[in-house]
Amino acid sequence: MKKLNLVVVFNQKMNQVLFCIRAKEPYKGLYNFVGGKVENGESNDDAAYRELFEETGIGRNDIELEHFMDLNYFKYENNLQVYVGVLTRDVELVEEKNKLEWVMIDNGLLDINKFAGNYNIPHIVKQIQVYLENGM
């Protein structure tokens, strides 16, 4: 299976999540978490930090990432590794290819016409919120 990652970034108040607006397929024009491919010979953790930095400018000094869960998509032969982190300080975002936007956590995450992932995004965010509330 091809290894991919998603990085879910919360602001310090934990009331907003960072999204990119996809510039290409799949999900072109929709909000999605940042992330990308795990390169050959690269650790999963290093790949998550690399993708986060490349796409947002957020580095290891700004956030501590934790591997949260994996989703396997057998039809596409993808192993999607979900990482989560809360910013430790204010950061200035640096956009790579996709526009970046902070989105308030509310029921708007359920809009399938706005968010990628066929309703996976609100499920992932809710599971992470429960996890963080119980002490990450």
Where are the regions a protein language model picked out?
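Conserved N-terminal beta-strand and adjoining loop/helix that marks the start
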Residues: 1-18, 34-37
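Glycine-centered loop/turn positions within well-structured domains
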Residues: 15-16, 54, 89
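Active-site-adjacent beta-strand/loop module that shapes the phosphate/pyrophosphate-binding cleft
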Residues: 3, 69-106, 118, 123-135
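A conserved beta-turn-beta hairpin within the catalytic core of GNAT-like acetyltransferases
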Residues: 26-29
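A generic structural signal for short hydrophobic patches within well-formed alpha-helices
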Residues: 108-112
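The catalytic Nudix box helix
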Residues: 33-67
